[in-house]
Amino acid sequence: MNEKYDPAAIESAAHAQWVAADAYRVDENARDSQGQLKPKFYACSMLPYPSGKLHMGHVRNYTINDMLTRQLRMKGMNVLMPMGWDAFGLPAENAALKNSVPPEKWTRENIATMKGQMLAMGLAIDWSREVATCDPTYYKWNQWLFLKMLEAGIAERRTQVVNWDPVDQTVLANEQVIDGRGWRSGALVEKREIPGYYLNIVKYADELLGAVANPEDPNYLSGWPERVRLMQENWIGKSEGVRFAFPHQIAGADGELIQGGKLYVFTTRADTIMGVTFCAVAPEHPLAAHAAATNPALAAFIAECAHGGTTEAELATQEKKGLPTGLFVTHPLTGAQVEVWVGNYVLMSYGDGAVMGVPAHDERDFAFAKKYGISIRQVVQAEGQTFSLDGWADWYGDKQRAVCVNSGLLDGLPYKEAVSKVAELVGAQGLGEKKTTWRLRDWGISRQRYWGTPIPIIHCDDCGSVPVPEKDLPVVLPIDCVPDGSGNPLKKRTDFLNVACPCCGKPAQRETDTMDTFVDSSWYFMRYCDARNSEQMVAGGTDYWMPMDQYIGGIEHAILHLLYARFWTKVMRDLGLVKVNEPFTKLLTQGMVLNHIYSRRTDKGGIEYFWPHEVENVFDAGGKVTGAKLKSDGSAVDYGGIGTMSKSKNNGVDPQDLINQYGADTARLFVMFASPPEQTLEWNDAGVEGAHRFLKRVWGFGVKQAELLKGATEVGAELSGDAKALRREVHLVLRQVSYDYERMQYNTVVSGSMKLLNALEAYKHDGSAGSAAVLREGYSVLLRGLYPACPHITHHLWSELGYAAKLGDLLDAPWPEVVEAALVQDEIELVLQVNGKTRGSIKVPAAADKAAIEAAAAASAEVAKFADGKPIRKLIVVPGRLVNVVV
């Protein structure tokens, strides 16, 4: 063996051996040495977007997965760790626009680069199952299932209000609208109502909610972080209340009553119905449009609202504005006339696009009424409180403590009883009923983008929107388009666009919208189970592997991706494609990787960021960083604290640079040791150096003791006291490390390995066979415990030192068992105190009773020394810990 630890040579040789053996390919028929089927375990990281290069967040995520996979394989399980590419999406279009290349080319090059980096990391990935969502063989099944959803009524075509960029001629996501303007063009964004396809996720809302909110639910996701369950519960947002109508006699231009003469609202606070002093409708509401036809000021206001946000989050932060319409509706219980306003805070997509205004008991309505001089009427009262129009108080909206007042038939009723009474009263008039609503909205999947799954629909003037026949799937996306910023290039591709109608044969056109990329990531984990099946979307492999046992990914995916994947699984179940109710049994959301941020203002008012290696920190007297200066010229820069690694802030670390300098094992070891997986990891160059030094020590011990380790026998009964002590330490560490693997607390797995190496290095070999045997056993435990984190160096040492000859390749070597007999001590050491102060220690037989311990303490030299001739008054024994001699 080479005395010097050479990561590049070691890792290259290990890779070659694993590739030649196809070491990570798994199937559904794996059996143990007795011919029994191995239990399965499916561990998967969220598939990455092929952005160009891996970042340290990727390294951390995949190393967590790899450690889990390798250790469970050693424990005899059939473990699947697949990988793929979330390859469609807007970033590829933007890169293509910038570089004048097709997104396909940019994407494939990035996949090749990132796959090479993953190989260099030594990940135990079954690459035979690799998928890329931009492959027609993959997205064919997006299209196929979409057609099945159409047949089942789960998918349907309807209109939607979207953010429209009039310059780029495309729909923008809400996060792409900055201060009302398109993020790229700078144009004022418009709200437009355009047709698109929606998936009825709300149909599954109760089931989706139960598994995250109700521990009694048979599908309750107890293996998920509570934080994620709560985020999904809030996003689904179940509300129970009353939907009722304000009748009116407002007729449209056609002479018919608008919306049948009923303005419907939904409220969870029907107990406050007697406090209604106005109603507000969305700018797109039919009553708003009717009033605006003869009111130029209102028409201008509605046009202004068209440049606002389209989400609840945006509306919550913007200034609340409104204008009266001059229209009135009738209060369903009092018969009073209630004025209708147009409010910029009302969403047409939420409920009926209208809300009742109760300023006395809703904080938003209170501010709106004060701003516009609308009357405020108190209708609930909490005991001991005083209502005032001067300002809002939290109790005004408290439904738990208050009872109805100034409300006629409702007076004195608490919240629940009042709501039931209102539902009864409006129901008797045929104007309403109790209803459950959801914050969750049906999933609009249409995107006016090129780089995505084509929606398999053909539009015919005679036949309407016609599904593409299954035999013609996939509808293949042209891969040579180069976006030029003038809208969806598919609209210009006549070879794609023009097609015969499947029904009548007349000229027709394909749908040019593509699917939301969340569609791609909603079922890829099932495709891994049967990735090469050209005849079926999923088959037997899915029955074997699903549900996934462990899913690993960032908290940023807690809502949309995970919710959509759960929904997609339930749809596939209902269509008879899979048998599971929930896709992911356990979820780990790993923490972000953080690093220091340094910057300063430029002469032009911009911000210039500096790499951490370019600066030197300035500390205060307490050792706290107060600033920094450039190493090159000593000029001051601002220290921005710790933040997420980012290319834009020059505080990222290129994993490839780390691998080139230290090797993949060092990179893996550091990201596992520096922090528990679910917590943030603060980057530390000194920590990387420390991890590398530790691996050099592991290597050095193996080299130094090579001959002894190769020639040692199995541990027998004849061991010296020191050998027994070392063996006990080995098995204590093994017990703790095994437990830490079960908990996925990989940082303490590494610290346990460090503790074990310290013990092995400190041990003085006495030349006996027993001593050598304990060293050999201890080092084998070290290599196996460390192997999932650092597979290359441990693989090499395992083979070179003869372990593989007896126990097989480290990939499938058995996980070591704790020998309980080794934990039994012949002798124990107790802390010795005199009058409560520690003065030394004593050793006594492990089986010593209280009298024997007291005798040993009384006879010790330390007691004689510190008692100073005084007689012993009392001895206090704390079993297994200490003895206190009171003089």
From Swiss-Prot:
Keywords, A to Z, come to: Aminoacyl-tRNA synthetase, ATP-binding, Cytoplasm, Ligase, Nucleotide-binding, Protein biosynthesis
Q: Where in the cell is it found?
A: Cytoplasm
Location (main, coarse): cytoplasm
What residues does ATP bind to?
A: K647
| KW Transmembrane helix (keyword) present | no
Q: Where are the transmembrane segments?
A: none
Report the CDD domains cross-referenced here.
Anticodon_Ia_Leu_BEm
Q: Which domain of life is it from?
A: Bacteria
Q: Name one GO molecular function term.
A: ATP binding
Which terms does the UniProt entry file under GO BP? leucyl-tRNA aminoacylation
By its UniProt entry, which PROSITE patterns does this protein fall under? Answer: AA_TRNA_LIGASE_I
Q: Where's the motif 'KMSKS' region?
A: 644-648
Motif stretch ('HIGH' region): 48-58
- What class does this enzyme belong to in the EC scheme? ligase
Q: Which reaction does it catalyse?
A: tRNA(Leu) + L-leucine + ATP = L-leucyl-tRNA(Leu) + AMP + diphosphate
Q: Which InterPro entries match?
A: aa-tRNA-synth_I_CS, aa-tRNA-synth_Ia, Leu-tRNA-ligase, Leu_tRNA-synth_edit, M/V/L/I-tRNA-synth_anticd-bd, Rossmann-like_a/b/a_fold, tRNAsynth_Ia_anticodon-bd, Val/Leu/Ile-tRNA-synth_edit
Entry EC no(s) = 6.1.1.4
Any one GO CC term of the record: cytosol
NCBIfam families from the xrefs? leuS_bact
Family assignment from sequence similarity: Belongs to the class-I aminoacyl-tRNA synthetase family.
Q: Which PANTHER family is this protein grouped with?
A: LEUCINE--TRNA LIGASE, MITOCHONDRIAL, LEUCYL-TRNA SYNTHETASE
- The protein in question is named Leucine--tRNA ligase
Source species: Leptothrix cholodnii (strain ATCC 51168 / LMG 8142 / SP-6) (Leptothrix discophora (strain SP-6))
The UniProt gene name for this protein comes to leuS
